[in-house]
């Protein structure tokens, strides 16, 4: 007798013992069967006949409980043999049926057996086991069976959490249906199992909302409130099938709600979550549930803003899910289907002469391979560990491993492949190689992306405004990036664009010494190497220009022995000489650099690699910026400003009385000199220029030459020490400072809309109310004591109240103080009555009361209909002209905007009053390449004058015609076309009733049309008609308005 025959004989005997066992010795008989089966059965032998008999015995009412007990013991989680496991799974449908048996003893044993199997099976065999359980839930009418199966699923979650997570899209609908069962016990068990199953949802963003999500399945009335809760959530974690399986039921119901606000929020959640999906196949099973709802809402929602949000969600879903333009859904990958993997392994086993009796084992192996494919486990060792014990049932181990490895390769080839990005090819020391995610406020910036930096390399970090370039730099500097080396392992220094204002009065040397980076001698030597003179080293930081502050920050970073320099806009405020110095320094210093810059020439000359933001990932390209653009043509706007598709538009400037051509000077400066108090010499001296509506002026010069001082005098921020400055009475100037954020830094907790409303709520620009040309100083107060002789009485002006035309100029209504006992001790000035007010010509007033006259001119300009209603819609439309969408303008705080978005807000706010002159100090700071291109085109099309201070020749070369070269306090103009009087060129016509006008309270001003002037013949005809009518009517005749002439 062979060993195999001996084994079969023992099994037959054990089977007989078990079939006649009583309740008292059933457990012992079952243990004997389990011990033998899970022991060392003869190689290449499996007890398939035993399990055929076992299945019949489980069905038999008389022996059912005994043999169920045997299965429970066979499925002992510690001892279940691979040669037995596939056959145990074939019994699951029968065991499920027995869990609903009328005999409570059988029910109990069947339920216990199902839980034992859930705990015992190989976790990757879930695809062979779970379908039996879900089919039982869908088909049975027995509530006891449902409760037992639900308990088995709960046990399976504990045993195979990661594998259940991938099966959630199939499991959740079945559990949801079961939660609606009429039987209380089933409802409670289903809810408990659903709660257990959601433990596989490894997503911190929705973790705390899972109880509400489960409640929504049972009670759809809770959907609106839950959507509201989730609408305020920041999504940063990767979205997996498990996450979507619990979220999609809620979102599909949210899209079908009546309230537009719920539909909008559901679209926002879909938009935010889909951006975090790594693989299109993750979202593929859910497209048919979300896409129709979004499409229907976009077609039917009346609110334009909600429709726009819905469209955004629709576009994101289509992009992430690879949906075509005609909404043909992509095919779901079948790489992990049992049919696919079974076909692959059967093909490989054709020449191996595998006996038909091993078919169940082969199918089981195919199921396990399918799960490994779904998990994207492609490692050879993992496949050997999980599957080799099952392959060796019918093959020798060495041969089994060869076949299994080929099986793995062919199965993996069926997985849909995403884009493959080659990493850098050259060798070198890794300073950083980490994977991380990054969010800012309510926005996800990077999701599970890799950052790899090597020693001595120079990297350019590129991406649009709001992508998170500066945020990434700060996060690295603050140690908030997972896996990035600590300062002890790798010294990383963030070189900021500007030094904190708290150090304004600190000397340059003391500032660096306070950083504890070396001795005074070493620090002084390094500063001298960076170009600082001895005088500059001892100067306060506040007296340094922006370019020298940048060099100071860089010197401090180098003294810290930095391994990595993080340079955020390093060329801001640097003139061409210092930019060339910086290029040479970075190229020769040997320090790894990560650079954010909008200066394409600088990146071209410095960078060896470009790290680009693409779909919440960082992708690395070898080469400088020009090489990057060749590989990525969509980024052409980084290289050519004109290539930008983004469009900005400035509002058309208001009409200026007396200005008939664009050449006429609206600002005129003659022999102007300015000197800061306490300095040894003037900053600028003997400067003359004029500006008109046609001006396109570039102000150039080295750092510290006096460019910003010149502009501050032009805009009224500073008053000249000597010389004359004339500005047209109604001229409005928009001035964006070099440090653009200075405009908004005290309003960070307002939304952009609230900031604009605050700034212009009085009708005037509150940002300009503290300008020097509007403040009354001692000299002004002294001049305002001028005594006027009016109607034979000495008077001083108390106030100026109104303005009217007077010949070719204006005259102003003034109230007075009457002088008594002038020149004596008892001199006094008594306020006069309003009836004593008088009108004084402008020429007489400006000598002594120029600032009061300017205030009246400002109010008259606003009263003439130039004021705009501060409504949310008007502000959103205005900001949209400068690249800010409504979501940012009305729903986001300024604090959460990126640097570029803040600059766009400053541009929008400064141009709110339809300026005649736009003055930009270093506009290339902080704006990305797309925005710079759009700004360049908008300034070119602007109907008013433009004055730009910049070191970027690229930005001004096609924009400006006139150049003011400032050097050593002197200004040399070139290319100018200054005229006296109106000058030549086309005439400007005043546009009547072009658009609605509003007063300071936002009320519409009804403008009556001017009556056409009649000719002499028309007047005679009208007179005859009037006389005829008068003759006919006699005393009853009354003239009408249209008969007056």
Swiss-Prot record:
GO cellular component: cytoplasmic stress granule; cytosolic ribosome; fungal biofilm matrix
UniProt KW DNA-binding keyword: no
Every ABC transporter domain range: 426-641, 667-993
Disulfide cross-links: none
Molecular function in Gene Ontology: ATP binding; ATP hydrolysis activity; ribosome binding; RNA binding; translation elongation factor activity
UniProt EC number: 3.6.4.-
GO biological process: cytoplasmic translational elongation; cytoplasmic translational termination
Tagged with keyword Nucleus: no
Biased composition regions of type Basic residues, renumbered to the chain: 1007-1031
UniProt entry keywords in alphabetical sequence: ATP-binding, Cytoplasm, Elongation factor, Hydrolase, Nucleotide-binding, Protein biosynthesis, Repeat, RNA-binding
Quaternary organization: Monomer.
Name used for this protein in its record: Elongation factor 3
Name of encoding gene: TEF3
